[in-house]
Amino acid sequence: RRADWIVTLKGYTSDVWGSEIYTKDNRYGRYQSYGSVQIMGKGNPVSRAGSGFVQEGWDWNRLPGTTTIHLPFNLLDSPLKGTTMARSKENFSGSSSLDGKNGMFAMKLAERDYENFTPDFVARKSVFCFDNRMVCLGTGISNSNADYPTETTLFQTKYNGKEPKVGEDNYWLHDGYDNYYHVVDGTVRAQVAEQESRHEKTREITKGKFSSAWIEHGKAPKEGTYEYMVLIQPSASDLDELRKTPAYEVLQRDQTAHVVYDKKTGITAYAAFEAYQPATDKVFVAIPAETMVMYAKESDKGIRLSVCDPNLNIEEKTYTTKEPSRPITKEIRLKGHWTLTSPMENVRLEQQGDQTVLTVTCLHGQPIEMFMENK
């Protein structure tokens, strides 16, 4: 969150359902938590409508940021007449932060096995947030649905007269609400179109004109990928500068990990989907599976570091539960001999040869933040 805008990132797990669908509410809401990236920053006061969201004509397949199978509305409608509270079989979905100013989101996406769903639909998604810049990555996008295309939506906004392709060589895509997108990896489609949709309560036909852009993964994709950058309300000089010199570097993007270095903040952020043992990392020897790590230099020998496992670690998988979240221990190996600048109850360090074993006890899906120095 900065100034007068906010971004909301949404996933779901075995403990947190992806959407609340009822008999006469949110009938087409299946994709709300498939990695959505909602920007709200326009309107007086700032509102959803002011930021480009209106229901009339809205394509429920295209929530910004989500990776989805683009279905006809009769198939997207919940197969259950009453309540649908779909949860994932995966537990790695959530966010972390560093110094309360910058953050990241990561998820293992896996669709449920319901009628008109595609149960082998999987993907690994991440969003890295630095100041007014977001880096969005996707890997392993796969499913067997050969009837309908799989897409990752950049934006869908009520058309306000501003064209989606802007800049020299159409380098930037513009959502019409002062947010700009550049796709590094992916086949992009952009359109301004009159759309026909359905009302989420009554299923009545609705219509509206929207500006949209998305990345095509095709039908029944195998190991699809994407990479794009988002600038939120940038200045003209921001657009010019970042076109010439990107502010970030992707250090790894595969099924094991998504790793991004941001040049302006100096932050390196890791979404480790599987056990990660980087060969040439400056700091880490090993990060365990399903862990988010962020760090930045604070001094010549010191770093600010955060570690997070978003899993609530709740054993009881019922509709609701009184069971509290349980601690999870993460063991991270660092190069060299590190010490904490101040003791912490939930952090332990042990020197092993020329490495340091950092043991962090995570709880409630919250990041544990610390200062460390290298001797």
Each model region followed by its residue ranges:
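Extended polysaccharide-engagement surfaces of secreted carbohydrate-active enzymes
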Residues: 1-341, 350-354, 362-374
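C-terminal His-loop and adjacent cap/lid subdomain of alpha/beta-hydrolase
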Residues: 345
